[in-house]
Amino acid sequence: MHLSPRYDGDIRALTGAPRADALDALVEDLRAADPAVRDDGAYVTAARWIPMLERAERHRLGDRITVHFTDPAVQARTFAPLVLARIVEAGDWREAWWSPFAEWYPAERDLRGHDAELGWLHAAAHGADLLAALARHPGQEPSRLTDLAVARLLAPTAHLFDAQEDDRLAYALAQILSRPDLGAEKATAWLVPIEKAFRTGEPGPVPAWASNTMRTLRMLYLLADRGLRTRNTDEPAHGVTHREAVLEGLAATLAVVAPYTG
């Protein structure tokens, strides 16, 4: 059985070499420059197939996708966390995948949301999606998740988020802050480096990283206040674990750049 270029095949109908070949083709197409191949074809198929794969197959897929974090092609790098997020949502995660992701995420310099030729790139948003998925996966240390989100926000950049990347990062942070095992101190400790960075501000144009961070924290304040829903589920809205402390911490941090607040 051979899959069409549109991935109309059902992975459950494949066994042996044809199944392995189909997964090999999927991995290769997930780095394709053509968005019709990468996004509309391979990624949509990956999202459909991943829950149906054997656990060992998901691990092999994750191992191969993680290599994409050092790929010279930006679209390969930026789609890697999106695929890993789907693997995490299917219930699997390997600790070996963390370091490649954590090294890439704050270091990625191409933060364009959409490119006319390459289609969606969305590095900041896709990385946030993986953080959000990990926040709901057992055994994750909340502090390293928040620390990585902060590292991405504070990394120097001239790119102003223009495709709701701030919303996606805020959502990821809200999911992390919703973990029941999160201690009260850790619920706000991650704000300390942001406050320090804000205090380095000088008169003149607001740096892109600062504007991106301000907007992320403002959306997070809304989510912490109103609650959040888990995307792609029918679960009711839930709140962050230490709501009052988080709201107070966010307000105090934002007041550094908005001294006119009450």
What is the predicted function of each stretch?
Residues 47-50, 56-190:
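Eukaryote-skewed repeat-based solenoidal scaffolds used as protein-protein interaction platforms
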Residues 1-55, 194-262:
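N-terminal alpha-helical scaffold/docking segments in eukaryotic complex subunits
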